[in-house]
Amino acid sequence: GGAEASRVAVDVPQIALSDMGDGKVKTVFADQMTLDMSGTNPDGDDYQLPATLDMPGNSMISSGAPEDMTHEFSYPTLKVTLTKVTSGGKETALPLNFTLLDSTGTAHLAAGKYDYDMSSAKLTFEGDVTDENQENVKFAGSADTLHTKGTMSMPAGVVDMEAHLGAALRNGLAMDGTMQVGPTAATFQFSGKDENGQDTSGAGQYDGKGFAASSTLAQAGMGYQ
């Protein structure tokens, strides 16, 4: 628990900054970067989850003063790829990927308050996961349009919010967010053994109209719908 519960290390090979001449600065990150998520799970086992983030053609335009900054971002492709997870010293294959297409939006930070608004034209995902009992699940799907927005008020003087969440909430930490997902379609296949040790398999598909969800977190409590 506490500060050692989880960590995220990000390796960015290159960041290019350019002055646009109108008080704005353009930032372009490397087309590919790596992430390494690690920590301790609820069972007390250490885990490590490496990932690759591909974002070719990305750009971010920043404007304003340091104490009141607005960032406008554009990510033509944003793809997260997982290959494996290590938990309790045991490595397991975890081939998963998630891709957002044509993502644009803004992020604004001023006086300890942060708000963001992001829209994506499409979300795709696929995976092929086999557990320790050799039961396998393959899935793939997509969603048309994805929109997220939210705000966060951050109290001064709280560096590690995970370790000191209670104190942060008492000092004014508050978050809210909404997500809207358009029409969604997915397919899946599974195979394995039944309770008698016999081979079993199946397949299915899902088609939905989409959904909306929202959440809040503040000293008064947590809510979602």
Task: Please name every model-derived segment.
Residues G1-Q225:
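Glycine-rich, small/hydroxylated-residue low-complexity segments
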